[in-house]
Amino acid sequence: MQIKLANPRGFCAGVDRAIEIVNRALEVFGPPIYVRHEVVHNKFVVEDLRNRGAVFVEELDQVPDDVIVIFSAHGVSQAVRQEAAGRGLKVFDATCPLVTKVHIEVAKYSRDGRECILIGHAGHPEVEGTMGQYDASNGGSIYLVEDEKDVAALQVRNPDHLAFVTQTTLSMDDTSRVIDALRERFPNIGGPRKDDICYATQNRQDAVKQLADECDVVLVVGSPNSSNSNRLRELAERMSTPAYLIDGAEDLQRSWFDGAQRIGITAGASAPEVLVRGVIDQLKAWGATGAEELDGREENITFSMPKELRVRSLI
């Protein structure tokens, strides 16, 4: 068996920044540091931060007074921000800047009284945060659609004063079909010049297509609650290549590779490279050889840290 590695894979700039914000806060201020929701959707990362003193909660009413709170990379609603401000909590915002860009778009549509359609997955924290940027007091509404059927059933107040945005971690192919359906039903709909799916999601989906085309089996390292990791697995399967989503080497089953000659490995944007290396080691223990890195797009994007966390404490 030969191992092929997708390129790029693993951490993106937004995930790097979010994890570093928690790490720096722990170093500068000491534990406990409270984090609203998992800072990124990866079991290994969350457990590591928890062991260092991060406390993960789902709502701010689980947070004591006079502590530091970090908002996760997925973003939060305006109501959550107002709740934190009302309690005087010290907040560091780890929202991915590309998610913040979508928030700004929604807020602008809201101020203009323009109704907004969000393409995304119900229940995902990024979707909840983005929906929560819309202020309906101006007379508009924000609607969530997941697929073309939702578009067909959608009832809006003014089809000529309408715009759309998208969740950043969707399947590019699926999203293109939904956008086409929106433009067909609402010819005057506005939106971004390109969809809001982030560069890292696009690059990893392109890379997994190449991987699935060249391999007999594809492994996606990522946690089950990771949206972008699930999209990678689905994309490989649509290309008729068996694909499995795994947290790490402990999830591997040897029977998956019966008759396989080429095994492809990629990782979602919230999965650290150490987990990929563990998978490679296990496959090599079962007789796999090599670990060929495929050609792919170079990523050199970085996002800045909050000012108070840019210099490590000397204490």
UniProtKB/Swiss-Prot annotation:
Chain residues that bind isopentenyl diphosphate: 41, 74, 124, 226-228, 270
Co-factor note (free text): Binds 1 [4Fe-4S] cluster per subunit.
Lineage summary: Bacteria, Pseudomonadati, Pseudomonadota, Gammaproteobacteria, Pseudomonadales
Annotated residues for binding of [4Fe-4S] cluster: 12, 96, 198
GO terms classed as biological process: dimethylallyl diphosphate biosynthetic process; isopentenyl diphosphate biosynthetic process, methylerythritol 4-phosphate pathway; terpenoid biosynthetic process
GO molecular-function term, one example from the UniProt record: 4 iron, 4 sulfur cluster binding
Catalytic activity: isopentenyl diphosphate + 2 oxidized [2Fe-2S]-[ferredoxin] + H2O = (2E)-4-hydroxy-3-methylbut-2-enyl diphosphate + 2 reduced [2Fe-2S]-[ferredoxin] + 2 H(+); dimethylallyl diphosphate + 2 oxidized [2Fe-2S]-[ferredoxin] + H2O = (2E)-4-hydroxy-3-methylbut-2-enyl diphosphate + 2 reduced [2Fe-2S]-[ferredoxin] + 2 H(+)
EC top class, as a word: oxidoreductase
Pfam family, one: LYTB
Entry EC no(s): 1.17.7.4
Record-given protein name: 4-hydroxy-3-methylbut-2-enyl diphosphate reductase
Active site (record annotation): 126
Residues that hold dimethylallyl diphosphate according to the record: 41, 74, 124, 226-228, 270
Function statement: Catalyzes the conversion of 1-hydroxy-2-methyl-2-(E)-butenyl 4-diphosphate (HMBPP) into a mixture of isopentenyl diphosphate (IPP) and dimethylallyl diphosphate (DMAPP). Acts in the terminal step of the DOXP/MEP pathway for isoprenoid precursor biosynthesis.
